[in-house]
Regions:
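Viral structural modules
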Residues: 1-167
Length: 167
């Protein structure tokens, strides 16, 4: 998938730099985590809805005056939904995928839902740009365990300049 104009939720110090910089360019994007949720489709017993959310650490360089570029870091997220055909399983399945205090704060395992597996490569950065904040944009929910992967609090308010990335 080509994912266009993902908002990057910068750390506080990175946001302060972005607000006063002349420009910024994304250097790289690293996949931090992929959240997978499998739920049955109500109208068909053999179909399942797979919800995926990808969490990326974004590293960028900001141009401030004539000095060397200043490093920025933040989080970008992308969600995708797919409906797949699968069969109910009668076997009891025990896997290491059970997570206590997972990214959604819950630990859920169902013996009757199929197991979804996602293979993902780190993305290639195609472009980036800066825009003024949109006051009506819905701010995504960021799980606390993802926020904990950053040294500072992530800025989710809409009033600032925003860094966008295309992966």
């Amino acid at each position: 998938d080509c994912i266009e104009d993902l908002r990057v939720y910068l750390t506080k110090s990175s946001q302060n730099i972005l607000d006063s910089c002349a420009g910024a360019k994304v250097r790289c994007a690293d996949l931090l985590y992929t959240y997978i949720d499998v739920e049955p489709v109500a109208f068909d017993r053999n179909h399942y809805c797979i919800d995926l959310t990808f969490y990326y650490r974004i590293l960028a360089d900001a141009t401030v005056g004539v000095n060397r570029p200043v490093a920025l870091q933040g989080l970008a997220m992308f969600s995708k939904r797919a409906v797949l055909c699968g069969e109910d399983s009668r076997a009891h399945i025990y896997t290491s995928r059970t997570r206590l205090d997972g990214s959604d704060g819950l630990s859920r395992v169902s013996a009757t839902h199929p197991t979804a597996v996602v293979e993902v490569l780190d993305p290639m950065v195609l472009s980036s740009k800066i825009r003024q904040g949109h006051c009506h944009e819905q701010v995504a929910q960021i799980p606390p365990c993802i926020c904990g992967l950053f040294d500072e609090e992530l800025v989710t308010s809409d009033g600032n300049r925003q860094l966008l990335v295309t992966l």
